[in-house]
């Protein structure tokens, strides 16, 4: 059998097993799913030594290949990280089970009752890079939402992912659930991804987590729905009526709390009428923290340390201590800038004016829009969703942080008592 044919056959086998397991998991009650999650957490704690050994082998290989220190840092597991993985599974067990929940049940003039029931999606493929903890997180979320999961991690983490998956499958067996409810793609050949994302007969949704190149490839090639976001070009707009103290706190936190996250501010927009009072204050703080500032001519006229911005800077997701700064004439220009250069991820306004706050909420077309709050709040835990599988900037199905409910669908249910349509 040729290599390509073998990969196709292997992926088809994974898909068939996942589809069969999904039918069983979809019927599992909450107690059984929670039993499995707690058992997974226990197995991860019990097998800490073997997890660390598998990860050490991955890290050694990564160093030999000359991978960047940032990638190796994301790849590395520690005892603390393993404990956090286990705790994450226990937190998922503590979340409310969305499956079977009925909403909007109402009588129709015909006498029937019509409502909606929350149901699993089926089989979810998660494709991710570097971070082994995603293996446990994704497995736990998919299971709690009544789905089977096919996990394809980065080749640099293959041994870590296999070791974590073994713990996950131990937990599934403990609860009497099929171990094929969570499977890891064993091959590191990239052709496996191409096969996985086109298996519409077996896979119901794909969730890519990784760099822009990976996500663009999957979005372009997939034949099944994809939950994704390409960039996190997040803005904070400081309005004319902003409270300066609030504006300083929000802008500082949105940029400097963490530089490498998708909900970090990348562009600061400031109303011209408040710029002279606000911009020198916030720029002093940011420059002292080592943030490189790139601004338009008006911003540079107010603050000496700002470098000239070019057109590409307004589109940039830096994921680094770099910030674009622009002075705008009014809220309309700010909203136009966000519509032109933003990524529909998270954008915030700092204002004390109710009507302008409402305008910003209505007109900014992003998955999260905030008033007087840091963009760093765009997170499943912060929104009360519990763990999240990612953030979606798409408009169909899930949008924003994707928690358990985002991994489900709905079906209409109709209740009658011998009713017929006249």
From Swiss-Prot:
SUPFAM superfamilies in the record: ALDH-like
Class of the enzyme per the UniProt entry, highest EC level: oxidoreductase
The reaction(s) this protein catalyses: L-glutamate 5-semialdehyde + phosphate + NADP(+) = L-glutamyl 5-phosphate + NADPH + H(+)
InterPro entries per record: Ald_DH/histidinol_DH, Ald_DH_C, Ald_DH_N, Aldehyde_DH_dom, G-glutamylP_reductase_CS, Glu-5-SA_DH, GPR_dom
Origin: domain of life: Bacteria
Keyword Amino-acid biosynthesis: yes
Keyword ATP-binding found: no
Role noted for this protein: Catalyzes the NADPH-dependent reduction of L-glutamate 5-phosphate into L-glutamate 5-semialdehyde and phosphate. The product spontaneously undergoes cyclization to form 1-pyrroline-5-carboxylate.
PANTHER family (alphabetical): DELTA-1-PYRROLINE-5-CARBOXYLATE SYNTHASE, GLUTAMATE SEMIALDEHYDE DEHYDROGENASE
Protein name: Gamma-glutamyl phosphate reductase
Gene this chain is encoded by: proA
